[in-house]
A protein has these predicted regions:
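Bacterial N-terminal signal peptides that target proteins for export
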Residues: 2-12
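Bacterial N-terminal signal peptides
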Residues: 12-21
Length: 362
C-alpha cells in the first residue's frame, strides 16, 4: 500500500517540477529600469539578462542611459559584448550610436569587423561605403570593403578594392603581406597565375630584405607550377647607365608610341598623361575611376590597359595603366608618365650607383 501511494506522489512532484519549468520559460525577467533606456535605444534586448547584468556591461549601460551619446561608454560596451560573441548586436549598437550622435569613423570601422564576423557581407559593404563617403582616400576603408566583397564571393570587386589600397599607399614596404596574398589568391582563383606571381613579387620588391623570404618563394613556386607564363607576358633583358640624379628617365614605348617616363618603383601602375594616352590609343571608354596617392598628394586616375609596354629589349603585354585626366604636363615638362609596378613587378629589377638593369624572371 505504501509503495502504491508513493508512486502517485512521485508523479505529482515530477509534474509540479515540469509545470514550474514551463512557467519559468513563459516568464521573462524584465530589463532593469536603470539600464532600459540604453538597451532600448541601442537595440540590445536580445542579450541575456545575465549578460546585461555583468558589471562591465551594466556600467556603460548606466552611463548611456543617462547620456545616450557618451562615446567612451559605447566603446567599452561594444568591446564587452563583442567578447561575449554578440557581434551582430555590437555592430547594430555602434551604427545606431553614429546615426544618433554624429560621425565616429572608428565605431563604423569596428562595426564592419563585427558584420564580417557575422557573415553579413552586404551590410559590411554598406558601412564601408559610408566611411568612403567621409574620406575617399583612406586605404583601410577600401581594404575592409574588399574583405567584405571577398566574403560575398564578389571577387573582381574585392580585387579592385585591394588594388585601390596599393594605389593609395606610396610606401609599399609598409603594406602588410596579407594584402598582396589576397590579391594573388584572387588572381589565381580566376586562373591568372602569372598575375598572382607578379603580386607576390611586388611585395618582395618593396623591401630588399624580403628577397629571401621563404613564404614568398613558396607561394611563387606554387602558383608558377599551375601554368607557364606566355613569352608575351614578360620577356627580354636590358641594362642602362644612370646619371647623377636619383631620378631615372627612360624612353619607353606604349602600344608602339614612344614617350619619356620616370622609373618609379613606388608607383603601383604605369601612369601617363591624358595627352600621351590619346597618342598611344589607350581605350578609356570602359576605364574605372581610381584614386592615386602621389608625392604631390592624391590624384584621380582612369584605370585602363595597354596592349604592350616596351623598354629597349624588355617587353610586357596587357599591362594595367592609369591615365591622369589632369592638365597637359601633370608629371613635369617633357615627362609623359611614370613606369610603375604594373610593369616593373613582372621583371627582376636591380639598381647600382652607375647602372640599373631589368630582366625577365628566371
Amino acid at each position: 500500500m505504501t509503495r502504491m501511494m508513493a508512486r502517485p506522489a512521485k508523479l505529482f512532484v515530477l509534474c509540479a517540477i515540469l509545470l514550474s519549468q514551463a512557467a519559468c520559460d513563459e516568464f521573462k525577467v524584465p530589463i532593469p529600469k536603470d539600464i532600459k533606456p540604453a538597451v532600448d535605444t541601442y537595440r540590445l534586448s536580445s542579450l541575456a539578462i545575465s549578460d546585461l547584468s555583468k558589471p562591465d556591461i551594466r556600467r556603460p549601460l548606466l552611463q548611456l542611459s543617462r547620456e545616450a551619446c557618451n562615446r567612451d561608454a559605447m566603446g567599452r560596451l561594444a568591446a564587452e559584448i563583442d567578447a561575449l560573441g554578440y557581434r551582430r548586436e555590437s555592430a547594430d549598437a555602434l551604427v545606431a550610436f553614429v546615426d544618433r550622435c554624429g560621425r565616429a569613423d572608428g565605431f563604423l570601422g569596428a562595426a564592419i569587423e563585427d558584420l564580417i564576423a557575422a557573415s553579413d557581407y552586404q551590410g559590411a559593404v554598406a558601412i564601408a561605403n559610408r566611411l568612403l563617403a567621409n574620406d575617399a582616400t583612406e586605404p583601410q576603408y577600401y581594404f575592409d570593403r574588399g574583405r567584405a566583397y571577398e566574403g560575398a564571393q564578389q571577387d573582381e570587386a574585392a580585387l579592385a578594392d585591394y588594388m585601390q589600397v596599393l594605389a593609395l599607399s606610396p610606401d609599399r614596404a609598409s603594406v602588410t603581406s596579407n594584402l598582396f596574398i589576397r590579391i594573388a589568391d584572387l588572381h589565381a582563383k580566376a586562373g591568372r597565375y602569372c598575375d598572382a606571381v607578379s603580386a607576390i613579387r611586388m611585395w618582395v620588391s618593396a623591401d630588399p630584405e624580403r628577397a629571401d623570404n621563404a613564404q614568398a618563394k613558396g607561394i611563387i613556386a606554387r602558383y608558377a607550377s599551375h601554368a607557364s607564363c606566355p613569352t608575351s607576358y614578360a620577356s627580354g633583358q636590358e641594362s642602362f647607365a644612370r646619371k647623377g640624379s636619383n631620378t631615372i628617365q627612360v624612353k619607353a614605348r606604349i602600344n608602339g608610341v614612344e614617350g619619356t617616363f620616370i622609373v618609379d618603383t613606388g608607383a603601383s601602375y604605369v601612369v601617363m598623361s591624358q595627352a600621351f594616352a590619346q597618342r598611344a590609343r589607350i581605350d578609356t571608354a570602359q576605364a574605372r575611376h581610381i584614386r592615386l596617392q602621389t608625392a604631390n598628394g592624391p590624384r584621380e586616375g582612369l584605370l585602363a590597359q595597354a596592349d604592350s609596354v616596351k623598354l629597349g629589349q624588355v617587353e610586357a603585354s596587357a599591362v594595367p595603366v592609369s591615365v591622369d585626366p589632369a592638365g597637359k604636363a601633370p608629371f613635369g615638362q617633357g615627362i609623359d608618365g611614370l613606369l610603375g609596378q604594373s610593369f616593373l613587378s613582372r621583371f627582376e629589377v636591380s639598381f647600382a650607383p652607375t647602372r640599373w638593369s631589368i630582366r625577365q624572371h628566371s
